[in-house]
Amino acid sequence: IRLAAPTGRAAKRLSESTGMPASTIHRLLGINGREDLDEIDIEELSGRLLVIDEMSMVDTQLFDLLLRGIPGGMQVILVGDKDQLPSVGPGRVFYDLLASGLLNYRELETIHRQGKGSTIIALASAIRAGQLPEDFTVRQPDRSFFPAQTTQVPRLIEQIATSWKEKGNSVADMQILAPMYKTPAGVHNLNAVAQEIFNPMTPKKREINIKLG
């Protein structure tokens, strides 16, 4: 049995969940991703079963290389979420394979990442269908909505993170997601806001401050 995923992180998670060794697809095929696609000589994979996780992240070029290495008689299981963001590279391989109707597939409907009665599940399903529930802005036990201008976001994050810390939580218990790197509401600035709260600079610690430019 061979296990692989598009990224190192996904491969590590796959290995942890199965208790079996897993690798990136590139490593499985013995390539580094910098070769000339037309000149790559892919050797046939050994084994009887190949499982590829996070298939939605696989682009057309990588899938082509993978197919070159699959020998006749090897069974292949592709695992993924067609509704996740598509691959960075060209193509929507996993989505198109399912839409083609040429493959047998099973769709898992039970969500284990959210507790029973979670409103996030219903909200995500509605947004995926292009709808916005009327109670989107109404505070729920497991989610809240705070309207804010771009310049107001850092202060809002500061208040939320400070409150979170005061309740005894650490930075490892919190995730901040942003759709971009720059702007006041971007990743770079919000990381600085979070660092000032959870790991501020202090004369009591030996630290090095590095600035780019």
Mark where each language-model region is.
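Short, flexible surface segments
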Residues: G72, L212-G213
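ASCE P-loop NTPase helicase motor core
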Residues: I1-T137
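Conserved helicase motor core of P-loop NTPases
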Residues: K82-L212
